[in-house]
């Protein structure tokens, strides 16, 4: 049974299908932590004025935070707006992470989590989930409490290939057709 983190679905599934393996959809697992990283980036951006250099860098290169660290380029690249201090994606990322300490910490937790998840490293994932996150914001703490609560189902997402992505895609197309077809 594949579901998101909605506890009612999980309770119903465990009661109606006692022998079923419950799996949290991989998209929802990754999204929960990536939303925390995105919100922290926005929070840091709001501490600067719109025309300050850090604000512009955080706004323009936000996708670097979500890119796998192993895929960050260290090769020379020309950047727009004469950002002469940057010579590669790695330089930009280092600058972004130097702006705020908690943003950097959340970034590395995100990278550890995604790496363990993508490599299907169950022990590594358990280690990341069970770390102490008391020094982080409430939203990050809540995220990892949720991960701890549903750890078995998250591990099942690694073990089994099932996903509800196809069903979600069909539902999205149906909603789009209904919206476009009206009027």
Name each model-derived stretch.
Residues 29-50:
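Short alpha-helix plus adjacent loop in nuclease-associated cores
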